[in-house]
From Swiss-Prot:
This is Putative nickel-responsive regulator. Keywords: DNA-binding, Metal-binding, Nickel, Transcription, Transcription regulation. GO terms for molecular function: DNA binding; DNA-binding transcription factor activity; nickel cation binding. Its cofactor is Ni(2+). One of its GO terms (biological process) is response to nickel cation. Pfam families: NikR_C, RHH_1. Ni(2+) binds at H78, H89, H91, C97. InterPro entries: Acetolactate_synth/TF_NikR_C (IPR027271), ACT-like_dom_sf (IPR045865), Arc_rbn_hlx_hlx (IPR013321), CopG (IPR002145), CopG/NikR_regulator (IPR050192), Ni_resp_reg_NikR (IPR022988), Ribbon_hlx_hlx (IPR010985), TF_NikR_Ni-bd_C (IPR014864). It comes from Chlorobaculum parvum (strain DSM 263 / NCIMB 8327) (Chlorobium vibrioforme subsp. thiosulfatophilum).
Length: 134
């Protein structure tokens, strides 16, 4: 027996036409694929809001010449060592670095780590991307 379930939904014509344009622009091959992603994203939002277990990445660029910035970044990462799985450091040019921090833990704790890093002077950009950990 298949693990796939089929069901029907009723939508206003304007809504389904807008949805079809959207998913075509995103490159989806079918409404089913797009709907699965929407459902997964909504469930992830719920998990995140409830403080559930998530995994993800913090991606940031920063100026490593800023006084004490590198030391503060390392200190903060050690403060949150239980959330950090690994880090990757890339030298973009003479002044700028890219750091990718793989994380796993409760969403609010990961968001605290992300916020602590984002507000440091010299951090040019930071993006947090979360996904389900199960």
């Amino acid at each position: 027996m298949s693990d796939l379930y089929r069901f029907g939904i009723s939508l206003d014509r304007e809504l389904i036409e807008a949805f079809d344009r959207h998913i075509k622009g995103q490159g989806y091959q079918s409404r089913s694929e797009a709907l699965r992603d929407l459902i997964r994203n909504e469930l992830l939002r719920k998990t995140t809001a409830e403080g559930g277990l998530v995994a993800g990445a913090i991606v940031m660029t920063y100026d490593h010449h800023k006084r004490e910035l590198v030391n503060r970044l390392i200190d903060i990462q050690h403060d949150f060592h239980d959330l950090i799985i690994s880090t990757q450091h890339v030298h973009l040019d003479h002044e700028n670095c890219l750091e990718v921090i793989a994380v796993k833990g409760n969403a609010p704790d990961i968001e605290k780590l992300s916020s602590a890093l984002k507000v440091l002077v010299g951090v040019k950009h930071l993006d947090l991307s979360l996904s389900s950990a199960d």
